[in-house]
Amino acid sequence: MHDVIIVYWRDIPAQVIVGKGRRATKIQLPERFEQAIDRAAMKSDQKSTDDYLAEWRKAKPFKVKGNPEDIAREQAEKLEIEYDKEKLIVLVNNNGRAD
């Protein structure tokens, strides 16, 4: 069993991490997620780099069986489907927050 952690800026996912430490498998989500984060950060008028960095968080880990590379890829694909263009637009318009 491997720990899976999703990294978010506010409520917008950015990265999938499977495992721990230097040997962890990491997958950056596609550029559209990075662009959504940038737009939401600019829209929310972050005052400093520290304010921006303070909004990054790791979700609570969950366990999955299998090959770490496969797990990371599958989790990234799930996020790509769940966070379609429309959902990212809603998040951007709400300053990166789901509620």
Per-range role (PLM):
Residues 4-5, 29, 48, 79:
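A general marker of short, structured functional hotspots
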Residues 21-58:
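Acidic, aromatic-enriched beta-alpha/helix-loop junctions
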Residues 16, 38, 84:
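Residue-level marker of positions within ordered structural domains that often coincide
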Residues 1-27:
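Short, charged/polar N-terminal "headpieces" of proteins
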Residues 48-99:
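Acidic, low-complexity intrinsically disordered segments
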Residues 3, 7, 35-43, 72:
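Charged, low-complexity, helix-prone segments enriched in Lys/Glu/Asp/Gln
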